[in-house]
Regions:
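Catalytic phosphate/metal-binding cores of nucleic-acid and nucleotide-processing enzymes, i.e., regions
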Residues: 1-145
């Protein structure tokens, strides 16, 4: 099963707070295959529930569906040039969980950093669930890109 999931707009705003870089982002995702995405998230309800809890969903006049969400993340890097702009694994690295996000990236691509940023505050509580979802993708040979 292939599901289209792609970013078409993203704003990243950084500010310093208590010596840490706060990353605020607002992103919009275009869902090319709404039914396929729904089926995909039925296989991985943990991830589906995480996403639906933090987004607004709408369709334009052409029936194209979008997810709009905002995320907040904390980078423990003191210098912006050490922060990985593309994915942003710094938090994962400090938590020794980079491989979890690497595995997720194979299937969630653009929303990998969304999962990391939005759920930073309770990431450790959710980590097992996210890991289970990644393995569920592996089991079903799901290809989201």
């Amino acid at each position: 099963m292939k599901t289209g999931l792609r970013f078409f707009d993203r704003n990243v705003i950084r500010k310093e707070e208590n010596g840490m870089t706060i990353v605020l982002q607002k992103a919009c995702v275009c869902i090319d295959d709404v039914e396929g995405l729904s089926n995909a998230f039925n296989l991985i309800p943990a991830v589906r529930s995480l996403i639906t809890a933090h987004n607004s969903y709408y369709e334009d006049e052409n029936g194209v569906a979008y997810l709009v969400f905002e995320g907040k993340g904390i980078s423990r890097c003191n210098h912006e040039d050490t922060y990985d702009e593309k994915i942003g694994f710094r938090i994962a690295e400090t938590r020794a969980q980079k491989d979890v996000f690497n595995k997720a990236a194979k299937f969630f691509n653009g929303i990998t950093y969304f999962i990391e940023k939005v759920f930073y505050d309770d990431l450790m509580d959710k980590l097992t669930t996210i890991t289970d979802a990644v393995y569920a993708c592996n089991d079903h040979e799901l290809d989201i890109k």
